[in-house]
Amino acid sequence: MRQSGRKSNQLRPISLELSPLINAEGSCLIKIGNTHVMCSASYDTTVPPFLRNQNRGWITAEYSMLPGSTSQRNKREAVQGKQSGRTQEIQRLIGRTMRSIIDLQKLGERQITIDCDVINADGGTRTAAITGSYVALHLAIRSLMKERILKVNPLINQVAAVSCGIYKDQPILDLDYLEDSDAEVDSNFVFAGNGNLIEIQGTAEKKPFSEEQFLEMLKLAKAGVAELFKLQNQVLLNL
């Protein structure tokens, strides 16, 4: 039993609030335990220079943490004049994940920017951002089709992500901050809706882990994202 009382294969309570932002084409406030992330998807007709006149679109992402999202105030990166390596890594992960589930040709010469702002951080912010961003992107695509800006749906898959780790020699699902900060192994799994993997990030924090332990984490992650896919579908089908 974990400090939170959860079983090793148990996710934290999850909720998805649709369209909390009135100006973005799509938005979602995802809450996974005490990790809360505001995700939005905004449409633009300007694409990166390397895509001009190619009739192909692009999806990019930005990620940030509000100053009050952590136990000690987190300084705004804009004030410091540069983004941290962690921020750049996470927003690139979100961007390439979303591009993997979109037919960029069908998107046309358009760009969608995914914005992920962490309101409260208690572990798993990047995986929550990916799971919430899919919902925001889905809503944005739906809005663009309703407005006849898009004639064909470019979404070709679903996506969700979850963290796993080895904590006190036991594989566990969906680590909170206390578990993450003391875990022997920390990993993130990003899955497409068809069961294929999009990305795996895994790091031994204290000691190397075995192939058997990796496969145990993979099994936990597959079961966890299945629950996330189900929740995404429930909220989107009920619109």
From Swiss-Prot:
Keywords: Nucleotidyltransferase, RNA-binding, rRNA processing, Transferase, tRNA processing, tRNA-binding. It catalyses: tRNA(n+1) + phosphate = tRNA(n) + a ribonucleoside 5'-diphosphate. It is an enzyme of class 2 (transferase). Its EC number is 2.7.7.56. Pfam families: RNase_PH, RNase_PH_C. The keyword Oxidoreductase does not apply. Phosphate binds at residues 86, 124-126. The keyword RNA-binding applies. PROSITE patterns: RIBONUCLEASE_PH (PS01277). It comes from the Bacteria. GO terms for molecular function: 3'-5'-RNA exonuclease activity; tRNA binding; tRNA nucleotidyltransferase activity. InterPro entries: ExoRNase_PH_dom1, ExoRNase_PH_dom2, ExoRNase_PH_dom2_sf, PNPase/RNase_PH_dom_sf, Ribosomal_Su5_D2-typ_SF, RNase_PH, RNase_PH_bac-type, RNase_PH_CS. One of its GO terms (biological process) is tRNA processing. Transmembrane segments: none annotated. Phosphorolytic 3'-5' exoribonuclease that plays an important role in tRNA 3'-end maturation. Removes nucleotide residues following the 3'-CCA terminus of tRNAs; can also add nucleotides to the ends of RNA molecules by using nucleoside diphosphates as substrates, but this may not be physiologically important. Probably plays a role in initiation of 16S rRNA degradation (leading to ribosome degradation) during starvation. Homohexameric ring arranged as a trimer of dimers. Belongs to the RNase PH family. This is Ribonuclease PH. It comes from Rickettsia bellii (strain OSU 85-389). The lineage of its organism: Bacteria, Pseudomonadati, Pseudomonadota, Alphaproteobacteria, Rickettsiales.
